[in-house]
């Protein structure tokens, strides 16, 4: 999709972080953007921020781990803009933890937000994009952890799933005029390490207390520090805009993990 001006995009997890960076980049390129998030106050603030730049944006609150709420968001988007050209499955949470800390609830929440919401988004918005015959694009946010596993197993599995889904759909949807890209960010300055702020009540038992000392605690502390000093989400948004315009299969934010990715594929050979 070489021209975003006049097109309509739907972005989940858009109240902050990478989602807001993507929404900002799309709006600056002349696209109309429907922002979707579970955090209502932050969502409203993001919309007001963008409207001050004369962007054509609106918002809809949804817990994307509920398919019915995502479906309602799709209906709201069509009612507001009439068409959808770009779907960005960006909402995500950090959950799961290493072996020995798992709970059924933590797996259900992590997979529900990170993977199932992506699947449902494509199921709901794919036909809307295909219907108008003007072409479109789907971007799904995975992670470097979708290519090289870290210590949070449920997170790894969910992000590997997003990568696999995107790779398969790219081949399948190309003849229908729909491009597919997967975003694999590294350390980005977001609130991903504070995902529990949005933990639904039904998953209240999702997390066991984390150790306050030892290797695991040190690793979590390191990740928090890297995230706090991470790449600006606005820059990531620009990379995604470029990725859509150039129909890139993979969108990376930096080259830090390239040697580890190469080592993985060398081991596979």
Regions flagged by a language model, labelled:
Residues 122, 158:
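Active-site helix of classical SDR
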Residues 98-99, 106-108:
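Substrate-binding pocket helix/loop in short-chain dehydrogenase/reductase
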Residues 29, 128, 168-178:
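Active-site-adjacent segment of SDR/Rossmann-fold oxidoreductases
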Residues 175-251:
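SDR active-site lid
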Residues 2-34:
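Canonical Rossmann dinucleotide-binding motif of NAD(H)/NADP(H)-dependent dehydrogenases/reductases
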Residues 40-41, 61-72, 104:
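The beta1-alpha1 cofactor-binding region of Rossmann-like NAD(H)/NADP(H)-dependent oxidoreductases
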Residues 143:
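Residue(s) in the substrate-gating loop at a strand-loop-helix junction
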């Amino acid at each position: 999709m070489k021209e975003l001006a006049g097109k309509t995009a739907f972005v989940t997890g858009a109240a902050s972080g990478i989602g807001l960076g993507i929404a900002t980049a799309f709006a600056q390129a002349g696209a109309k953007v429907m922002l979707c998030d579970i955090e209502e106050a932050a969502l409203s603030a993001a919309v007001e921020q963008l409207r001050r730049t004369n962007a054509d944006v609106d918002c809809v609150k949804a817990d994307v781990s509920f398919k019915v709420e995502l479906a309602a968001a799709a209906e709201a988007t069509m009612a507001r803009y009439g068409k959808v050209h770009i779907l960005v499955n960006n909402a995500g949470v950090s959950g799961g933890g290493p072996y020995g800390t798992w709970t059924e609830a933590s797996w259900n929440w992590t997979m529900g937000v990170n993977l199932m919401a992506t699947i449902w988004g494509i199921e709901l918005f794919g036909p809307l994009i295909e219907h108008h015959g003007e072409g479109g694009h789907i971007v799904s946010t995975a992670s470097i952890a979708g290519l090289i596993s870290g210590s949070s197993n449920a997170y790894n599995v969910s992000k590997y799933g997003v990568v696999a889904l995107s790779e398969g759909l790219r081949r399948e949807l190309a003849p229908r005029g729909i491009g597919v890209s997967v975003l694999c960010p590294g350390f980005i300055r977001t609130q991903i390490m504070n995902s529990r702020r949005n933990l639904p009540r039904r998953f209240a038992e999702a997390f066991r207390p984390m150790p306050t000392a030892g290797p695991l605690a040190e690793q979590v502390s390191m990740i928090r520090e890297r995230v706090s000093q991470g790449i600006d989400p606005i820059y990531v948004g620009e990379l995604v805009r470029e990725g859509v315009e150039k129909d890139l299969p993979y969108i990376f934010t930096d080259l830090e993990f390239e040697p580890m990715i190469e080592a993985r594929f060398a081991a596979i050979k």
